[in-house]
Structure formats: C-alpha cells, structure tokens
C-alpha cells in the first residue's frame, strides 16, 4: 500500500487594494489624455517599491475626459470588493496638482473623527499619495504644467458598502478606497481592524465617552437594551477584542462595555485577544476550575470537563446554582483592565445564543440589568 503523504495546502494568494486599482486606472486615463496611448494593462509602483502590472477592462476617451477600469482582485482574501469594477475618470485642469472626487459607489465623509475631513471623498491618504505621485511623474515626463481632476468610482459600491462599517462611520454613498501597502494580505483582517479603530475615533470625536464593543448583532441588541446606546457608540469588534483594548491606550474614553457570547467571553477571560476559533479555543479545564472557585462540587467539575461546548458547561452550572457566567466575566474584566488605562471604567457582559444575559462584571450594582 502506498504511504500517505502529508497534505500540503497551496499558499494563499495575495491581492491588490482598491487604492492600487485607483492608481492604475487613473494613470491609464491620464496617459490617454496626455499621450494618446490606449492601454490594456498598466504598471504601477507600490509604496514599498514593488512594481506590479494590472490588467484593464477598458481605457477610453469620453467627451472631455478619459476613463479606465480594472477588476479588483483581492487574491484569496474574503474581501467584499473582490471582483468589483473600480474605475477612474480623469480631466485635465489648469491648476497644478490633483483634485479628488467621489464617483458612483465611493462614499463621502459626513462625520468628524476620520483622517479625512467632512465632505471629502472616502479616498484614504495612501491611495491619494499613490495617485498623486504617479500622475505628477507622468506630467513631468510629458512636460505638462497643469493638473488633474480624478473621479474614482466602484460599480455597485453603494450596495457593497452596506456590508461594511462605512454607514456607521458616517461614510455615506459607497465604499472607501483603501490601502497602506497596496497589497491585500489574505486573512490579515487589517481592513477590519482599521474599521474598529475608526469606529472608536468617530465615536469619541463626536463626544461619546462611553462605547460598547460587541462581538455581533445579538450583543449589540443587548447593549441597546441595557443602555439605549446609539449606533455611533457601538463598536462592531467581531473577534478582535484586542484591537479595541489596545486602541484605548491611544484614544481616551470614560467607559468601555464589552459584550459577547459566553464562549467568546471565556476566551477573553483566559487572556486571548483574538476570539476566533482559528486562534483560540474553549478551555474546559479552566472553566471547571473557575466553577470550583464559586461553589461547584467535584461532580459538577467532572461534568464540565466532559461537556461538548461552553454553553453546555454554563447550563450545567446554572442548573446547580453556580454563577459560572459571572465568574468568567470577572476574569475577562480583570484581563481587559490590564490592557486599557486605569482611567477607563470597564464592564463585561456575557450572553447566550438568544441574547439573554448569563453573566456580568464591573457593572454598577445599583442598576438593575434585565
């Protein structure tokens, strides 16, 4: 019999950001205007010096402007913009420099707190710099002393943006043009973590001193019920609680409420800052020890050790009158406090799959939580 060989998964493929797409398409359109050159591909230089070639879907003259488009290729990253058509429309202008406009599918900033001013198109600083550098270099090569008006759009971007954090951040009408390196690293989650930071920045800039970081929809609903907290102060952190806790070292708030499913809160209690199953797991022996600390007898501890899920361990404890949920929240609270500044009041809530509270710590004992 032939020996089995270890499976060797293919390496994940990197992609290119919407900022790279915008740079390539704006350069191709500008080159058509200045040189009369129609391109089916264009080469750009990424911020760290790497040269990449990007294929164009079209490059054409339309009235008094040129436009070009490319399909966003995010590689193996599950990016909402993967496969979207990113386009640039470029007009020549008398004034030197580059003026950016939001086309269809690209959002506009409507709230303070982001790196872009209110009213600006949601084209982030690095993509702006990439486009500006490429366009000014082209102008110098062609002896052109004027400037460029650049409109960036994403086909279907307004609908795609509803699947992102943009509406909550006050970026309305479409997507953001993003990227710091020009490259999308598969499953790096850099964009998601950046949106968490932006959410905190927007909330605090707009005067909210109490934010609630939630793992999902059910925990957000719980925080709305407990505090009637507005959406702008609800931070959709998913599994990235560490992104919230570390950012509060740089951004000041008075109070942080953390709310999530019992299983995820138990991971936080064990000192994990990425709560996804790829990076952390439920520690049943630890749950059994914590249960023992609040009254679980040897029999219940053995049941917890044999449990299939954290929810089952919680249910067993509740049936025995053992407040495992509160104890887990207490440990999660202590860990969170070890990360954020001492000036931040922290509280932790754990919920079941129906959104009911099953544990809490750091909560004002004078206030009834239902």
From Swiss-Prot:
Its EC number is 2.1.1.195. Pathway: Cofactor biosynthesis; adenosylcobalamin biosynthesis; cob(II)yrinate a,c-diamide from sirohydrochlorin (anaerobic route): step 6/10. SUPFAM superfamilies: CbiD-like (SSF111342). One of its GO terms (molecular function) is cobalt-precorrin-5B C1-methyltransferase activity. GO terms for biological process: anaerobic cobalamin biosynthetic process; methylation. It is an enzyme of class 2 (transferase). Keywords: Cobalamin biosynthesis, Methyltransferase, S-adenosyl-L-methionine, Transferase. It holds the Pfam family CbiD. It catalyses: Co-precorrin-5B + S-adenosyl-L-methionine = Co-precorrin-6A + S-adenosyl-L-homocysteine. Belongs to the CbiD family. PANTHER family: COBALT-PRECORRIN-5B C(1)-METHYLTRANSFERASE. This is Cobalt-precorrin-5B C(1)-methyltransferase. The lineage of its organism: Bacteria, Pseudomonadati, Pseudomonadota, Gammaproteobacteria, Pseudomonadales. The gene is cbiD.
């Amino acid at each position: 019999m032939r020996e089995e060989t270890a499976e060797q998964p293919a390496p994940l493929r990197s992609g290119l950001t919407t900022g790279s797409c915008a740079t390539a398409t704006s350069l191709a359109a500008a080159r058509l205007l200045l040189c009369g050159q129609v391109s089916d591909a264009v080469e750009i230089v990424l911020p760290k010096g790497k040269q990449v070639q990007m294929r164009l879907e079209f490059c054409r003259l339309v009235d008094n402007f040129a436009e070009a488009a490319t399909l966003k290729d995010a590689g193996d990253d599950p990016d909402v913009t993967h496969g979207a058509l990113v386009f640039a429309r470029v007009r020549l202008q008398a004034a030197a420099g580059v003026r950016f406009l939001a086309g269809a599918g690209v959002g506009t900033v409507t709230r303070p707190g982001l790196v872009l001013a209110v009213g600006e198109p949601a084209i982030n600083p690095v993509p702006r710099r990439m486009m500006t550098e490429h366009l000014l270099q082209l102008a110098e090569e062609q002896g052109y002393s004027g400037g460029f008006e650049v409109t960036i759009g994403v086909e279907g971007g307004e609908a795609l943006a509803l699947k992102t954090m943009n509406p909550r951040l006050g970026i309305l009408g479409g997507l953001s043009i993003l990227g710091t390196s020009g490259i999308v690293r598969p499953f790096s989650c850099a964009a998601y973590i950046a949106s968490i930071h932006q959410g905190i920045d927007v909330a605090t800039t707009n005067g909210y001193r109490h934010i609630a970081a939630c793992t999902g929809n059910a925990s957000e609903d719980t925080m709305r019920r407990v505090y009637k907290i507005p959406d702008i102060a609800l931070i959709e952190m998913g599994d990235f609680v560490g992104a919230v806790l570390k950012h509060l070292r740089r951004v000041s708030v008075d109070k942080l409420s953390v709310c999530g499913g019992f299983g995820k809160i138990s991971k936080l209690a064990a000192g994990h800052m990425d709560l996804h199953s790829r990076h952390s797991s439920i520690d049943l022996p630890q749950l059994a020890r914590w249960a023992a600390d609040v009254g679980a007898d040897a029999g219940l501890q053995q049941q917890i050790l044999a449990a299939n899920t954290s929810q089952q361990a919680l249910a067993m404890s509740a049936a025995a009158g053992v407040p495992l949920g509160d104890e887990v929240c207490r440990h999660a609270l202590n860990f969170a406090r070890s990360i954020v500044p001492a000036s931040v009041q922290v509280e932790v809530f754990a919920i079941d799959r129906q959104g009911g509270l099953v544990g809490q710590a750091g909560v004002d004992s004078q206030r009834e939580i239902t």
